[in-house]
């Protein structure tokens, strides 16, 4: 049993580091007074706190939120890390999360959103999408990677139709998926070129 666990996390340095940072930030958010003002993305305060474009995608508000996000992230990210490298996982996570944050910004005033947002879903879904682009038929929990991404996209759309007020979160999620797919296709092309040399 222990050997299986070791084998499962072997070579997952970036994956585990990102999960650890998310856990530390979550604990800080629920225990340290006013730290949310420093870490969460608030469109009204972005010029004062530009770093929140990054810190927001290491943040979670509820235990179930971080549990689901990090569980999903671990499953896909460790596969991407085995296939590529720790550096690649980190770059994809940061890129998808950052673009997700930027995408959120113009939608906030459209729906009259005021206050901070929280969540790593754009970054997490982006990493999953990158792996799915590279290995679309790879089986994860009895489902193909490409089907998991399709399910995320459809689910996000259904929730948006049912509640347009989540537009800002949905926009960031879409951005994460799209950027992740672009990263994954680029990595796949690079992989194919290397195999020819």
Features from the language model and the residues they span:
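A detector for small-residue-rich transmembrane helices and their helix-helix packing motifs
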Residues: 1-197
